[in-house]
């Protein structure tokens, strides 16, 4: 109740879902406001939200699992899989994970929804550029390329490998690609405030979602992401030695981003939003090593960009 009161009293979210972690266990889930006002459905810990860039963490875990199985290494070069990409001989898996590959691409929306993983990859390769610059350049295309590598290494679709590596073993019942959503599922509707109307729908573009292979096309509940975090932090997805290598990098430029994790005060931070929908959907997880404590916080009506401070305050309630 303290958690919900703190969340509702904040001016960060009007509508949100939360899961709370303590000592490797989910100790609380809940929600504030409507998941879908038209259907009179309230947010709760099982409400599914679009993950946005928080999905990169899941993709990185799939890569880490393949590394643990010796099917890849952090130093494996892109040229082994996609030799036609410029500078591919000098681009490693590690650099793709950390947006240090030199690949550049804006968040673009195609005219039509892309209907297969191969179509997504083809479109991405047409739109992106590869510069040879290995400074930090954030681009979703890095994770589409990683998904393409997963496809080549395993001979399976990326969706299938994600299912086999994470979703099925962890019994995630509220995690689906946007293409698999049904009217019966508890899915959050995005909202924004327009004048006196707090229930102005803010629709996500399916065409945009279709481009975000490995980086933002999956819907997930706060409870399910908390399960993933706990499993990853306690060695259930890959050995902890590999996991710690996966989420740590030191490039000497002060930017600690590694494999979807944006570090903050030595704690792990996952964060996502959609450029065209900044006032509705946002996803965030803030957690400590070994899942000692943490908060997963998803919003479908975001009133402020200061979501991190709210997550830190909520995490302090259980740490």
Features from the language model and the residues they span:
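Short, small-residue-biased leader/transition segments that mark boundaries at the very start
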Residues: 2-13
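A short acidic/small-residue loop/turn micro-motif
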Residues: 33-37, 209, 302-303
